[in-house]
Structures are given as C-alpha cells and as structure tokens.
Amino acid sequence: MQNLEQITEQALDAIARAEDGKALDAIRVEYFGKKGPFTALMQGLRDVSPEARPAVGQKINDAKQLAQNALNEKKVQLETAELNAQLAKEKIDVSLPGRKVETGGLHPVTMTIDRVTKFFSELGFSVESGPEIESDYYNFDALNIPKHHPARADHDTFWFNPELLLRTQTSGVQIRTMEKMQPPIRIMAPGRVYRNDYDQTHTPMFHQIELLYVDKKANFTELKGLLHDFLRAFFEEDLQVRFRPSYFPFTEPSAEVDVMGKNGKWLEVLGCGMVHPNVLRNVGIDPNEYAGFAVGMGVERLTMLRYNVTDLRAFFENDLRFLKQFK
C-alpha cells in the first residue's frame, strides 16, 4: 500500500504541474493507460489472499478515483484558461463606433445617360443599339458623307481596314433601324464612339446619344420645342437656348444648339437638324412622304456642363476622390 500512496502522490503532482492539454493527456496515458501503474496494481490483486482482496481493491479504486478527479478538474481549468485567453485576444470594444460601410455609386457619365434616356423614353422614344465595330457604309456612306470628307481621314478615325472601323458616331444605329422599321420611328441610340483625339475636352473613346424621329409631319419647329424642353429639364433651369445654323452631311437644314452659361457666355451642347432626303432614300423611305429630325449629343460634354467639370479626362482616371463627389 505504500507503493499505492507513492503512485497516487506522483500522479497528483504531475497533474498539478501540467501546463496545457497536451501535457495533461500524456499524464493520463502514463498513469491510467493499459500499461500504467494503476492498471498494474489492479492486475496484482490476483496475488493477494482472497480474504484481503476486497479491501485492497477498494483502496486502489479510491486512489485511482482521487487521481482521476484531479485530472478532470485540471482539464476543466486548462480549457477555461485557454478559452479566456482566446476571448481576451479576440475581444471587441463595444464602446467603439462602428465602421462606416462604403457604398458604391453610379459613374457621372452613367447618371447622365440615365437622365437623358429617362426624359425621352417618357416621350415615346425607345432605345436601340448597334455594333461598335462598324462598316464604312453605315458609318459614312449611308449618312450622305462623301468619300473626300475629312472625318474619314486616319487622323480622325480608327480604321481596321478600308471597310471596317471603330464607329465615330452612333448614327449607324439610325440607318440600321430605318432599314428594318417603317415610319413612324422614334428612337434614341446611346453608346460608345471613338475618334483619334486626346486633350482636355476630347478622349479617344467617349459616349454619345442620338435621337431619330421620322414621321409624315416631323418639322423643325417640333425639333426646337423638344430640345428647349429637354435642356431646361436636364439642367433644371429656365435656360436661354439658341440655335445656330450649321452644316452636317446627314441633315438639312442643320443647327448647333447653345445654352447661356452662368458666366454670360454661350456654351455649345449638341447638334441637330432635319434628316437629309438622301439619307431617307438610302434606307428606302420616300422623302416626299416622310420627314425626320435627328439630334446628336456628347454625354461627357453634357456631364461637364451639368457638374461644372473642367477636364473631360477626369471621368476615365478612376480617381475615387473625384468620383465620390457624385454619390
């Protein structure tokens, strides 16, 4: 029994000195495993006389249970300490203010496109689209633009070959629409266009929205009234608007439209005109029966004027300090 007391004391001491779960598990195997001293003592009962065997067995069980209880308590202590350490490491100061969630916003160019298309869709104009890689027929020929026109030159247009180019305007959408639809036609064509130019007010890629209206009674007076209403709604001001005679191969008569700026100067905002009879003939519409008007506007130009932006290139530099102003 002296040996039993010694084993029990050693087990209790080892358990008390265990610093983590791994060390405690090693002690469990050492003292309570199949080859441990408590197991050996129980196996040694066969050498004890039958009369003394019950009492000796009881003492061994009591000692083993004492050590087992100590081991269980130590295990709880270590697990609790480990949990507390983990909680302390991960604790959150609930008195701190929460972090603000950054939400995205629409790009100012997208906002302008949405604003323009919403206005005209309420007047019955539907959105049409077309390819950005266009043929010279749809980009130039069908629009009454002659072969010698400077817009066809390499310094203005990105050509793939003599017949394919990056479209310089969304007017090709008008031609494709008139080929497949019969008047009355009332469409708008927003999209990307490309020109070989880059400075403070020009970029190689920009956005354009064109309008086309074809009907038997389409006239310039109706066009002027439509654009007056649009510009005042877009800028949310009762602006002064003027129409200046101009020249576009695909419209006749043609005009450029200006608005009076806050600095007292006229600012050009878009071009327009009555669809040229040759353009109508090119798509099989009789110009003696139908007339039409077309409008072309640069989205970035409108956006710059609405939000007082001085450099068009800022729209494409992905500077969050700039873009956050429009959220």
UniProtKB/Swiss-Prot annotation:
Signal peptide: none annotated. Binds 2 magnesium ions per tetramer. Its EC number is 6.1.1.20. CDD domains: PheRS_alpha_core. Pfam families: Phe_tRNA-synt_N, tRNA-synt_2d. GO terms for biological process: phenylalanyl-tRNA aminoacylation. Belongs to the class-II aminoacyl-tRNA synthetase family. Phe-tRNA synthetase alpha subunit type 1 subfamily. This is Phenylalanine--tRNA ligase alpha subunit. It comes from Pasteurella multocida (strain Pm70). The gene is pheS.
